[in-house]
Amino acid sequence: MAAHTPIRECIGCGGKFPKNELLRIVYDGSETMIDADSKKEGRGAYLCKNKECLDMCIKRKKLNRAFKCSIREENYNKLNEEMRHFVE
């Protein structure tokens, strides 16, 4: 019997993918950060590892909805710089 693979939704494109194919972004109450190991505490959101989903997330401020709060512009800018190392 095959092991269950968790499915998560990308906040950029809305597609559903296996959890290990997506990048987790965490909000700990004060800042957003990339959680490449899926071990950090805080509310998480998932994003495809491609430039289009990243750009859509930033342009439409999708993290505000995912984290149910207002994310500051400097957090989006910081995330944009960090994400460039992970996107294809």
Model segments located where?
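Cys/His-coordinated zinc-binding microdomains
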Residues: 14, 49-52
